[in-house]
């Protein structure tokens, strides 16, 4: 006897007007994640997923393309306005925010949520080039 295939129901797309854009910008990469207000991921993109490799992932242009891709995917869910939370010291911070606005998302808030230690872990040693 063959097992009967159950009919898979098509997953309905959520409709979210308000979103939250989390931009994590390091020296080596930029990751843009767009979530709903509860924190469930709608779309994400990084400099690597848009085709950059190696040191080019840390550039502002790579961050711009990553933010653009994430914004386009999020707009399919009906996202119109976003709050932006930026984390990290990387080069792609400003470029990613500007790119979100250029893609047609209205930015209602920009907040820096970079974690700052109260003298926690010892930092890596200084580079001598």
Swiss-Prot record:
- Family annotation (Gene3D superfamilies): Ribosomal protein S11
Give the record's GO CC terms. ribonucleoprotein complex; ribosome
Q: Which species is this UniProt entry from?
A: Carboxydothermus hydrogenoformans (strain ATCC BAA-161 / DSM 6008 / Z-2901)
The protein, known as: Small ribosomal subunit protein uS11
Nucleus found in the keyword field: no
Q: Which HAMAP family match?
A: Ribosomal_uS11
Q: Name one GO molecular function term.
A: structural constituent of ribosome
Q: Which Pfam families match?
A: Ribosomal_S11
Q: Which UniProt keywords apply?
A: Ribonucleoprotein, Ribosomal protein, RNA-binding, rRNA-binding
Family according to the record:
Belongs to the universal ribosomal protein uS11 family.
NCBIfam families given in the database record: PRK05309.1, uS11_bact
**Superkingdom in the source lineage:** Bacteria
